[in-house]
Amino acid sequence: MERTFLMIKPDGVQRNLVGEIIQRFETKGFTLVGLKMMQVSSELAEKHYAVHKERPFFRSLVDFITSSPVVAMVWQGEGVIASARKIIGATNPLNAEPGTIRGDFGISVGRNLIHGSDGPDTAKDEVSLWFSDAELANWTPAITPWVVE
């Protein structure tokens, strides 16, 4: 079963959107298999955003992610990576469709509420960066037969 990493960023936590964001993925029928609220260290933030290390916004991105707690999550389900990207919306909230998380709640690209893995390889790397195997639950919700064939 496919898994993806999602992180509600400090702005989403501070704006009390954690429940609303989680609900969107639960309602879709995906399974939450890992969840933790945490203060991100600079070391973890730098590893997570290493692909942006040479970009001019790297330091401000690391500073933002470490400024306040985040909610790190692992979700599981058929097509969860692509579907999560659609639920999240475009990186720039001003370009995000209404009905998406960023389209409904975001205003600024620097405060776009949530991060989601962009593909299977990234998802695998991000899940293992943020969670140990022991922190992930292997379970099947009772509703699964009502969601997927």
Curated annotation (Swiss-Prot):
EC number: 2.7.4.6
Enzymatic reactions: a 2'-deoxyribonucleoside 5'-diphosphate + ATP = a 2'-deoxyribonucleoside 5'-triphosphate + ADP; a ribonucleoside 5'-diphosphate + ATP = a ribonucleoside 5'-triphosphate + ADP
PROSITE patterns: NDPK (PS00469), NDPK_LIKE (PS51374)
Keyword field: ATP-binding, Cytoplasm, Kinase, Magnesium, Metal-binding, Nucleotide metabolism, Nucleotide-binding, Phosphoprotein, Transferase
Any one Pfam family match given in the protein's UniProt record, by short name: NDK
Compartments it resides in: Cytoplasm
GO cellular component, as recorded: cytoplasm
Claim: Oxidoreductase is one of the keywords in the record: no
Binding site for ATP: 9, 57, 85, 91, 102, 112
GO molecular function, one term: metal ion binding
Active site feature: 115 (pros-phosphohistidine intermediate)
Main location group: cytoplasm
GO biological process, alphabetically ordered: CTP biosynthetic process; GTP biosynthetic process; UTP biosynthetic process
Enzymatic class: transferase
CDD domains linked: NDPk_I (cd04413)
Names of required cofactors: Mg(2+)
NCBIfam families according to UniProt: PRK00668.1
Function: Major role in the synthesis of nucleoside triphosphates other than ATP. The ATP gamma phosphate is transferred to the NDP beta phosphate via a ping-pong mechanism, using a phosphorylated active-site intermediate.
Subunit architecture: Homotetramer.
PANTHER family registered for this protein in UniProt: NUCLEOSIDE DIPHOSPHATE KINASE (PTHR11349)
Family: Belongs to the NDK family.
Stated name of the protein: Nucleoside diphosphate kinase
Annotated source species: Microcystis aeruginosa (strain NIES-843 / IAM M-2473)
UniProt gene name: ndk
